């Protein structure tokens, strides 16, 4: 137990444990990559020296941005995002194209009576009617209204003079106020009758209007007839007027004198007629008595006709009148409807044939003989992919190209000691490997730590291969500011307003302004001066006649007075209008300059527009202030461009070395003591039951087994117990050689003979023998050392017990066992060191069936099933209406296989095949003749370091100078990736390197390459013979899937497909089949197109050695050789002086690119980037060359970046110590030491030196010598030194030419099925397949659309004689022939007529195809055919008058093309009603929802019956030419069957029984639904028949607030069965269907007619089905019955 803990402790604390842990971490983080070679490619034979790590260098400059990486692999499908917000309504789309003509609608119900129309226009003048009888005398009319007063009469005769009035003394009277108007005079006679007015329409009586203003008096009327009335009596005196105002007092003399009356003056001239006065007010009514009624006047002239009165009531039916005269002949009527088909007429007369018209096509002739084999046709379309190929082994392939040189072999055994007295001979050929020696005695115990003296620095090695990528480095320092080539950003917001500007200088005078608008009126002006006297006015109108003045007594006539004084000034007049604007004045003089001493600053102006961006200013000084807190981490930047190569780093510090006492093997020692017991091993198979426990006798030693393949070196073990001290070796101890790099594993050696034979002389290398027979199966090798533990696999199924294994070889005798009691079980040990993976075991027996796994995800849609058996022939349908010329049909099924074609042209030589499998080793060949000397071979790979040889003879003391430098060694193995180094300083730009070699093929397949250019077109095939044109058939329904055709010729290469998903692992093959017999040679194929270049193949095996070449030209000087073996150590020299530092070397060239790295694991998805600003469209660049341009010059180094934040601690534990730095340059040589002792001459003059003494303890390290000066160049005369150890690997050579192909190996066994590869390119189209068997006859297609108008038909046969008795014959005049009318549209087909004595019937339906006959020999060419029958007569003449309708035909009419849809609401297809052919069946689609919007289907239209069911029968496409399917939560809703509601969503086959089936039938008329809104079944209208009764289904909603409804006229609104959940929701993306809680169906309810307009309905909840059905309205679907 204690030992165990000690062991565990030593294991955990040993440095190997750290390596072990790191190895597992490396395995974890590196996706399990292993590095070839022991110890992961490191040199384990040297002591591990771990120098301290140097201080961190300055950060290098930021490298240029790397190129954009290749397109990453397609990421995994993301989880569905949350439901997006509802998008804005889209803009209305463009108007769609005009749709097709819809089907004929159902005849509508009669409309409501229209409103009476407007009165029509007056008819033409009628003929004069017959004179009527005199009418009876009418009743007297009502008295008319009072007429208007007549005009004033003429003045009467003058009256007689009255009596003289009395004289009056007037004392200044005034004119009195006008008296009241007198009474009106008597009415005048009526005027003459005016002209007849046009009659007005009869208006409604209006309300009385308001009184209008008094109009101006009219002009006087015409003079009336002279009145004959008598003078009336004088009226009574008027009333006394009011008192007038007092007048001015006139002094009149009193009448003391007598006044004389003057003489009557002369009558004045009549005055001018005054203007008419204003009309007087209406007078009071007169007082006269009403006169008697006058006698009736003469009849007036005939009035104009009145307007149309309202229509009268209908009169009684009159007596039948006498027959009228025959009318005139009318115009020709339009062409009548087509009558029913008449009886067949008598045969027509044979006319002379019209030559140009072509005859009617004849009946099809008998089948012709087989023609000769035609020319090879063009390649057919690509066939379907063929079945997977057989898994038998193929024939032996051609020899592959030579393989890559093998790995270096293991170190050879030590050679035989050379003779001490001979000069060194040529190096011998390598001997056969010796037997393993016996174990030596144990050496002395080693000290814990051995110090090595540091060796001399070796020459600078070549650059090693690029190692695998290192772990991710720490976060780098913050980069310098990048150059911004971004476009300028958007314009910023306006800045703050600037300070007010200084006062500007005075501006120039402006141009004169426009005229201003009219100003407001001014204030009233001051009083103006009096104006000048006006001109005399025009003559005024004459005044009214004055009244007669009173008599004035005047004595004297006065003189004319003088002019009076001016009157007082008048009042100011009104304002005059404003005057017009004046003309602009002349320009004034400039005014004096203003004073701005005390001017206040103006108000702040508006902010100015932003100025253009300024030029970049110089960089400002650093700002003040403390540095702010570090900002949040920014988004990851774009990857930078790859930097140019940096300068080489400075030389590292010298590392410490550990001295290794290398001891060489002594004689074989005694056997060592038993080691401590090992760790507990893995449990072995159960052994056979043991005997009792007495010790057994020691067995005999077994024969040595064959040496196994050495396993990889194990981890370093604990220090062993000290062994027995060995005897002193005989060899003098040489100085330690430089450590060699470990060689790769050599090939397995031939087992030596157990007897110790001397090694024989090596033979010449033989030529490769012919391939040998396959050897027997070899014995199993010894088990290798344990490999690392594999990743635990998933537990397999339990297999049955295996067969008993064969008995193993006897083991090595074990140590004697201890007492036989069984010990207590130990604590479980630590996990053992990893073992190597074992060979794959034989395939196990098939295990027991496992438990059922969880349901997998829904699979892809399966392949179409096998074709069903052909159904029975259906009844023959009625002939369809002739359809239009159909479009080109679908491509036909492949025909029967044709006879084999003629051999094609020889193909171009194919590409080189992939290397074949390794051949079995051949028999040993006989020794060939010696070949010519070959050229100097390439340097071989470095061999493993051999064991130290015995000391050779002392050489002749030839004072040789330093040898030429040795050849460069092969490249070393790639090391582990080191920690990320510190950033180096930036290097100068190197020259462009040579192109690197092709890298090894990557582990993962790269993205598909760009399509290559298309190959040259193949030669054109010979033209095929043209076929006869067939009759275009109706488009059939799609037939069953035919048998697969034979493969077509290769098609054109398709675009590379997207990479398919990884296939499932196939079942292992049971065992290899024997190779099949050799097939017949195929016929040469067509010339293929140039294929897509294949991926680069793996290197093939090494081919046989070619014949020796002719001696070549002598090669150029080789590279200097390796340094020679170290000489004996000289005496220690004096320390030299310190040398000057050497000049700095130039930067080296760029290295070649390393091999492609292993593809890393998928990174986690990055954050979404911000939306970039929209860039401006760039100009199109010139197309670049195909190659990349040379890299640009290196930019100036940027400023040093700011110090970055400290990184978070890394995940990994501290890494391994870095590798030792490169050796420094050699120092100058020290001064020469004193001469050594003279060496022994070859002639034996000097005695042998004594044996060397024991070695003393190592002295302390001396101070480091000063490098000596460089030596002088050696002489060429002297001997060249022995070849030194191989140097470090040289640069990789250029790639050699491919070797010749190797021998063909036997076919290998079938491998297990590989994993499914990526999707291949589509194959080239195969040759045309065999013709398939003819399909079964399809169902009759639906009637096609109405075809175009056909050519004019032949003239019909004469019809039957008309029925003379039914109509009276009125002979008509012959009509004038009308002009030729346009060609009429094709009429509807007539009803089917009576069967006539028919001519030959139409050919019946095609019979089933007979078996192919034997092809006959070609017959002789036929005779020339007879002349065809006469063609049709010419175009028809102009149409005659409309014929009488024909007699009614017999038989059923053709169907009309109306469609009827039936939904069964079960999973059974419904049957069509009798007499209605079924067009198709399908599944009942109710509506679909896409993008959260529903689109409803009317269940009465054929679109609701989809022939194929899918949970998502649609995709959606956008304007970017991209379509998406099953990318959103789109849904479809289907009518459901009566299956019980499921608990879980339905998927796959479960769905079928829940979807209602439907059928589409052709009906003779349109069907409509009628609804009762109560529990009774509503009756169909008269002459309509019932199709089904049901329940009134109104509308439905599903997910969200979306849904639809049924038109109540549509048969879809009458479902035969009522269900609360009549439909099911299918979620397209999941492929499942379910009845969800948010599905609602809406049904018309029953309504009591008495409660139609009553208060609101009473709420109710119905849970029982019968109660629900009683509440739902009933309906019936009816169709017009003709």
Curated annotation (Swiss-Prot):
Disulphide bond pairs: 1472-1561, 1505-1558, 1517-1523, 1580-1678, 1614-1675, 1626-1633
Location of the motif Cell attachment site: 86-88, 137-139, 181-183, 587-589, 593-595, 716-718, 980-982, 992-994, 1144-1146
Subcellular location: Secreted, Extracellular space, Extracellular matrix, Basement membrane
Keyword NADP: no
Gly residues bias (residue ranges): 969-978
InterPro entries: Collagen, Collagen_IV_NC, Collagen_IV_NC_sf, Collagen_Structural_Proteins, CTDL_fold
Sites marked Cleavage: 1197-1198
SUPFAM superfamilies given in the database record: C-type lectin-like (SSF56436)
Protein name, entry field: Collagen alpha-4(IV) chain
Organism of provenance: Mus musculus
Lineage: Eukaryota, Metazoa, Chordata, Craniata, Vertebrata
Gene (name only): Col4a4
